[in-house]
A protein has these predicted regions:
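Flexible "cap/lid" subdomain of the alpha/beta-hydrolase fold that forms the substrate-access gate
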Residues: 1-126, 146, 151
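Catalytic histidine-centered segment of alpha/beta-hydrolase-like enzymes
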Residues: 130-142
Length: 151
């Protein structure tokens, strides 16, 4: 549960997470991003991209939007997903699931098994990375995407 603290934290009613994050958005974002990488550092990020992320996250409206995404996942999205499951709705297009082998998702329920409950034709592979596959291991991420798209 400690690894996924961000879900219940960010889903709290406003303005709690917005206020706490807004007190030092650069510290919060750097901490979260570093802790979600396999190396627990920001080394995988191009400095220009990191500057862009930090600039965007200093905007209170973007912080709020991030929190709203988690609130939706905890409440409205959950209800929609539940209704889809009860109706027997499934994703029928071929689907590729990628996840970081050292990421939080890998420590919870197996990601491929989770997606197989929702899709009829899903394949997947763990990328040797944390949460940020494209930044941490671009070669393996691109190879997995190209393989899937060429089939």
């Amino acid at each position: 549960a400690l690894k996924i603290y961000h879900w219940p934290f960010l889903a709290q009613p406003e303005p709690l997470p917005e206020t706490l994050i807004g007190g030092n958005p650069e510290f919060y974002l750097k901490h979260v991003m570093a802790s979600w990488t396999a190396a627990r550092s920001l080394d995988a990020f191009d400095p220009r991209a990191l500057t862009h992320y930090l600039t965007a996250f200093r905007d209170p409206l973007r912080i709020h939007a991030s929190c709203e995404d988690y609130r939706a996942g905890a409440y409205a999205d959950y209800e929609h997903d539940k209704a889809d499951r009860e109706a027997g709705n499934r994703i029928t297009t071929p689907m590729l699931a990628l996840w970081g082998g050292a990421a939080i998702a890998a420590a919870a329920a197996p990601p491929l098994a989770a997606w197989q409950q929702w899709a009829t034709d899903v394949t997947g592979v763990a990328i040797e990375s944390g949460h940020f596959m494209a930044e941490e291991n671009p070669e393996a991420t691109a190879a997995a995407l190209l393989k899937f798209l060429s089939e």
